[in-house]
C-alpha cells in the first residue's frame, strides 16, 4: 500500500485522503514551468487545480520572491494543500483557495491580481465511464474543468507578459492550439515527453503567452526523454528534478 507521505528535499506532501497522488506529470510541470532564457522571473503564480499543493510548493521553492496561489475544487484536497503549504518553509508566500476557478465568486479571492505564471495539470479523461469515487472523478475527468474553459479563464488572468504552462496528453495539442488561438494566446515552448527513446510521446509540456505582447517567432520545441535506457535517467530529466527528489539517480549520458 503506498505511503501517504511523499518527501522531497525541502518539503513533504501529505496525500492522506487525496484522490490524485504525487506523480511524474505534476513533478515535471512544477520543474519545467516558468523557465525563461531571457531571465524573467515570475512574481505572482497561480496553480489551477492544485490538488495536494505539489506544484505550488515547487514554484515557491524555485522562485524565492514569488507569491503563489493555488485553487482547488475538491475541498478535501484543498485542505490537504493548505496543510502541506503551512508545514513548508514557504508558508508565508503560498495561499490555497477552495473553489471552482470558473466561478466568478472567486474574484473575491483573486481580486484584480494578474499572474506572471499560471500552471495547471488539468484532468483529461473524456470518457463517460467515470470512476465510482466522486472525488477521483473530479480529479481525473475533464467535465470538472474542460480544457477550453481552462484556457479561456487563464487568458483572463494572465498579466500582459504572463505565461500559461500546462502538461496534457500529446493528442490534445491540436485542441490546445485551437483554443489558444480563440483566446489570443500563442505557443512559446513545447516539450514532448517520452518515457523511453523508442516510445511515442504520451505527454506534452506547453507554454502559452498573450498574442498581443508575444514576440513573433516560432515556439522553442524539444523532447525530454526520461529513461534513455531501462533503469537509467537522462541528464536532462535529472537537471529538472534533482532540486526536488531526495533519491540519487543512475545517469546514462546520451550521445
Swiss-Prot record:
Main location: cytoplasm
Iron-sulfur listed as a keyword: no
Highest taxon above the source species: Bacteria
GO cellular component: cytoplasm
Gene Ontology MF terms in the entry: nucleic acid binding; tRNA (adenine-N6)-methyltransferase activity
InterPro entries in UniProt: DNA_methylase_N6_adenine_CS, SAM-dependent_MTases_sf, Small_mtfrase_dom, tRNA_Adenine-N(6)_MTase, tRNA_adenine-N6_MeTrfase
Gene3D superfamilies given in the database record: Vaccinia Virus protein VP39
Localization terms from the record: Cytoplasm
Catalytic reaction(s) noted: adenosine(37) in tRNA1(Val) + S-adenosyl-L-methionine = N(6)-methyladenosine(37) in tRNA1(Val) + S-adenosyl-L-homocysteine + H(+)
GO biological process: methylation; tRNA processing
Record's keyword terms, sorted: Cytoplasm, Methyltransferase, S-adenosyl-L-methionine, Transferase, tRNA processing
UniProt keyword Membrane present: no
Stored HAMAP family: tRNA_methyltr_YfiC
Membership in a protein family: Belongs to the methyltransferase superfamily. tRNA (adenine-N(6)-)-methyltransferase family.
PANTHER family listed in its UniProt record: TRNA1(VAL) (ADENINE(37)-N6)-METHYLTRANSFERASE
Name of the protein this chain belongs to: tRNA1(Val) (adenine(37)-N6)-methyltransferase
Source organism of the structure: Porphyromonas gingivalis (strain ATCC 33277 / DSM 20709 / CIP 103683 / JCM 12257 / NCTC 11834 / 2561)
